[in-house]
Amino acid sequence: MPSATTILSDLPDDVRLHRLEALVVASETLQRASGLDDILHAILDLVSNQLDCERATVFLRDRRTGRLHARQVTGSTPLDIVLEKGVGVAGFVAETGENVLINDVRSDPRFDPSTDRRTGFLTRNMLCVPLRKPEGTVMGSLQAINSRHGDFSDADLAYLASFGALAAIAVEREQLAQEAVRAQLLSTELELARKIQQRLLPPPGRLDLPAPFSAWGASQACYDVGGDTYDVVMLSSGECGFWVADVSGKGIGAALLMTTLQTELRALIRMERDLARLASELNTRVTTVAPLGTYATLFLGVLSADKGRLRFVNAGHLPPVWAKGQAASPTEFEASGMPIGLLPGSFYEAGETEFPKGERLALFSDGVTDAENTSGETFEPAGVINAHAGIRTHEVEQIGPAFFEELDRFRIGAPAKDDTTYLVIGLD
């Protein structure tokens, strides 16, 4: 079609001057407008006034679904209009990027009369142009409906296209500004979530426990927040309770479930001595709040210094390893139940074993065993055992850092793909 400048030159001088002045005013108005709704309202007021039409509409594309949503409509009460991809004139324009002028909509197959039927409005003629980003992507469409002076002209269409170009720039600018605000809010929320998590987890390093217990732990989140958790608590019985849990998934969702899990565990371990019943109750509580398909593996132990015995329950978690230097070896603490939160009504079996004085037990999440090096090889449970076998000290505050050094040496600079949690428990 001819350019806007060419068509404007065909208009009478007074009309041409008026329209050019209106475009300048439109540009200034859109630069001053703040907020997407204000920008869209300003666009439609300008279109309605300059083209003297009964109704004007801005449609914006939903980037997720591809549907068009009528964000602003003039000449009526706000309408909830949603168009599937390619439906109606607005949908056609958004898909093809073409400018459309129709002076008899009933004779044009692109026109969709369903909105008229819903509202009682009678559409006679219309103009529709794409809202195009600077790089060419169409973000929506701009419509002018029912000229009050008869038919729309090519000059009207070119004029609306000029408004559409200004509107697209303003909308794109505002959407980018909104995305920046959302990103900042998300960053703030992530930082808050990270701080909350840090308060729920023990501080990394040696944990403050009465003799003869000792422990060292650390958890490194793959993202700003993680789904792994661990803790060590002294019980009124004089026993030492401890656990490592790994929530499925990563990021905010996993962190929320981790928070629930940590809070519930701290309460239940002080109320319920039977670890099988404790795990069942924990599973019940978690399944009521966790989204479907979200779960956590868990190894939970209670160590008695007087008896030299360890009671434990394993809910789908990796078995720990004995971590005393050259005597490092796998344990037989295999899973005795489903992961926590996976299935309502799950039952668990508790186990018990000897825990000699001087022994060390290492617990870890699958971020350890699944760690990859630059060749794509994984650390595996065997890597955990071999790493401990090479550590010559028996002090937990030295075992922990030495183990992470071995893990980092294996990775050779490859980035972590999952949260990494490690806890070593000792009885002296």
Where are these regions (language model features)?
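Signal-transmission linkers at sensory-effector interfaces
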Residues: 1-38, 139
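Acidic/proline- and glycine-rich, intrinsically disordered low-complexity segments
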Residues: 77-100, 105, 333-336
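GAF sensory/regulatory domain recognition
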Residues: 45-48, 55-81, 85, 106-107, ...
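Signal-transducing coupling segments at domain and membrane junctions
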Residues: 67, 76-78, 103-125, 146-148, ...
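Short beta-strand-to-loop transition segments that serve as allosteric relay/switch motifs
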Residues: 6-8, 73-76, 141-150, 171, ...
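A short, aliphatic-rich beta-strand micro-motif
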Residues: 124-135
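… and, occasionally, acidic/histidine-rich disordered N-termini of signaling adaptors
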Residues: 177, 181-362, 409-428
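Amphipathic alpha-helical "output/dimerization" segments
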Residues: 22, 134, 151-175, 259-263, ...
